[in-house]
Amino acid sequence: RIVAMAKMLANQILTLVIGPSLSKINLWSPSAEELVLGTAIVESGLTYLRQWGDGPALGLWQVEPSTQSDLYTNFLNYRPELGTQLMELRAPNLSMDENLATNLMYGAAVCRLCYYRKPDALPEAGDIEGQAAFWKQHYNTPLGKGTVTKYVYEVSQVLKEA
């Protein structure tokens, strides 16, 4: 029952949030969509809006405020059109941190931009092991607690029912 609920939630987040969000910043592709969904599954279980414990990470994609700040300072400041597209997803009455925590379209776009700024090509759609390795290297980082095995297992559990 829990897996069925996670599958339903994953399908809704994919259709109502991730797809439209990535399209609005002109960075949609099947592989990007899958990677952003997989990231939400493994980072928050599609459940947590604030990092479990004492950590600073926010939203389904568990982005740290310092990562968001760096994205603007060292990446979007040099790509004003992309920065404007992201800001159009932002809820203006919320702080940047509140947007990360509660604005799903904004959070999905920030996650995608975290991957976009890396020079490596995204793994192909359907390549969960490749996506897991890409997530570990570029998002969770080598020092992060996540593992490729955990990504593959958790994402497979949700997506095998889809």
Question: Residue ranges of each PLM-predicted region?
Answer:
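Long, charge-rich low-complexity segments
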Residues: V148-A162
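Short, charged interaction patches at domain edges and termini
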Residues: G130-G144, V155
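Short, charged helix-capping/linker segments at alpha-helix termini
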Residues: S23-S31
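Inter-helical turn/loop segments and adjacent helix faces that build the functional surface
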Residues: K118-G126
